[in-house]
């Protein structure tokens, strides 16, 4: 009995909603003399902004989600990424930041060090591709460091420092000296008040990033 009442209520609610949407349309398309006409916005009508046009803070940078965590890994090919870079270029993006170079066992480039630690071999070298596309469309690329996943479980940042000291050197030697589009580094580690050793870890990783690259800009996750 209760299920039937609920179904009746939903049917009535749906009919009432449809009627509410249809009634204004029917009234709007019938004149006083019974003739029909189509409503359209006046060509002379325009929005009246109370602030100057093109006076806002322009967004010129964006993050590249390397899709190794929440979304199936590497589900775009280079054609899709190339088109995405074209769209970004057209709207004024000149800086792209890879959120992270890997998470746990999924990685974005064939790192000898991380493969030796049990990570999976990626199907494509996303880092190389991003750098080539950034160079093609005159953008700067920022490399996001590796996320071991251990500190999410333990809140201990020492894992990040240990792994990334090899990743930083490896990446700079492989890509940094090769591509002019390599613009800097991103320490992607997210922290909280429960994270152990965050200040020391950020200092150690950030200093190494700058030292190997001749002082390229290095920033941290907000």
PLM feature spans:
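Extracellular glycoside hydrolase catalytic/binding regions
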Residues: 190-199, 206-222
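N-terminal export signals
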Residues: 2, 8-30
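The substrate-binding groove and active-site-proximal loops of carbohydrate-active enzymes
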Residues: 65-75, 111-122, 153-162, 188-196
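Aromatic-lined substrate-binding rim segments of carbohydrate-active enzymes
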Residues: 83-89, 97-146, 201-215
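An active-site-proximal structural segment forming one wall of the substrate-binding cleft
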Residues: 123-133, 156-182
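C-terminal segment of N-terminal export signals and the immediately downstream linker at the start
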Residues: 25-52
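Active-site groove signature of glycoside hydrolases
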Residues: 148, 170-197
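Short, acidic/polar
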Residues: 74-88, 164-173
